[in-house]
Amino acid sequence: MRNSLSLAAVLLGLPSCVLAAHGDALQLDQQLITASRTGHSPVSIASSNLITRDEIERQQAGSVPELLQRLAGVSITSNGGRGKSTSVSIRGTSDKHVLVLIDGVRVGSATSGSAALQSIPVEQIERIEIVRGPRSSLYGSEAMGGVIQIFTRRGGAEGFKPYFSAGAGSRSSYSGSAGVAGSHGNGWFNLGVASESTDGINARAYRSSAPNAFEPDADGYRELSGHLRAGYRFANGLELDGSWLQSENHSDFDSRSSSGASGRDAYSDGSLQAISGRARFSPLVFWDVTLQAGHSEDLGDNFQDGRFYSRFDTRRDSASWQNDFNFGEAQVLSLGMDYQTDRIDSDDDYAEDSRYNKGYFVQYQAAFGRHGVQAGLRHDKDEFFGSHDTGSLGYSFDLSDALTLTAAYGTAYRAPTFNDLYYPASNSTAGNPDVKPEESESYEIGLRGSHGWGEWSVNAYENRIEDLIVWAGSSPMRPENVDVARIRGIETRVATVLAGWDLDANLTFMDPQDRSKANHGHLLQRRAKRQFNLDLDRQFGAIGLGASLYAASERFDKASNVEDSRMPGYALVDLRSEYRLDEAWRLQVKLANLFDRDYETTQTYEQPGRALYFTVRYQAL
């Protein structure tokens, strides 16, 4: 763990780096902004979800992937238990097609192409916004399947309000968090720390094809994190907002060779950091300017046989300038530019270890009576592969006060990673500097309703991805643009109150087809065709009861869909309860995987069985 949490002290001493949140008197930050990059949007077209702090605590979730799995169109695969490598898929795309932001700053590895969502501490999160569908016209590369934006905890009521939690559970699992939030006048802040540890489970199952590789041990996980977020609004309307989040983690994993002679005592030490700052001001009554700067790090050292084995570090710096022109309440024109540099460091010698990208975007949003329009264009220029243009068009029509019809079209792309382009050549693997960006084209239509009894929505979509980058061949294996995928799906959701119980359910039907010549018509790897989620909650005075059901159909671990790669469908049931001692104190208990179901999301990797967790929470009023 090479970074120190003492960085908080540096930030506390640099108020000039604390920059801006969108907002009207510091309130606009509570609105969804990811779908449009604006605090005020006259239309609502994108298929999206919001997970609030209250929901995070009610669900008693232990990780970000656990929270995301209960959403329509989102699926999770994991290489073992808590803290192990985890992939999040939106609408059948890969984890490399999902853009992850923390307080507006892009995070993730520039070598692997994915973000370590399993290492983002839930105790430091205020809310999560999830947008399904392409958003490259606003954000550029990676936003093919969707965008996940995580916002750290922010200030609360006037004065200083401490909070803390402590938990314990199965497999010697322990967690704790503490912080203080508050505000005074036009300023606010939130400062917190959190830690967790677990002995975990045996990450990898016994394989008859490699019996000597079996390592029957518990693969544990430890994490220590801290965050700081603060903001101030001056009398002249200038708003400053800044945040810092850092998570240090240690994760054991199984990596013994087929002969059993090497790869023992394998573990990784990782560090994730995101620093963001924004300033917002209005030169004219209709013109809002937002300046943002950010820095993120994804660092990882791997060890085998108790010795250093490999290092893959990513450091990203970014800046953006956005201008929002508000023509009344019904029209917003946004013009902006983004600049980003990626730098990698590895024990391997890459041909290139840095690159930059410039992006220019324009977006128009308008509401005309019962009609809504959202249109965007973006031009990106990458240092290595050149220019790329993307666009989007959305339309909504209010059939009545309760029913809205939506339609959307968008193009997107994903730039090749440093591994794709420059992975050092060996007898087994080598990068390919000629590989091109992946491209996609997506269509969507939806209908949603809001009534006295609740709300519901139905969305149907098709996404076609071309020039998929696949590592193929042998001696060495190299990445090539060879594959095509066509993903069709229907997502449904209903939320209501039934017999006094709050009910929230969603059902996803998906046909994630591989359209390449070799595997035409097969399911994409590790994608399920059907998923169902059901949440039930009810309050009985001071006692709250809840239950969650998650079910998924079979999936295949190999692109060929051969029988020996089939992973059966499964269903999981969780129970939870909460007792309020008073308005400040709560006792919580959760029983996960009630029926102790054995299942896999990645072949040969185990998943946790039945587990019991207890938590006590305090929040000063």
Regions found by a protein language model. Give the residues of each.
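Short acidic/polar hinge/loop motifs at secondary-structure boundaries
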Residues: 105-132
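Periplasmic-side early beta-strands and strand-to-turn transitions of outer-membrane beta-barrels
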Residues: 136-137, 149, 155-159, 163-167, ...
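Face-selective signature of the C-terminal outer-membrane beta-barrel domain
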Residues: 231-249, 266-398, 454-460, 497, ...
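Outer-membrane beta-barrel signature, preferentially recognizing the C-terminal barrel domain
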Residues: 259-282, 312-315, 383-384, 398, ...
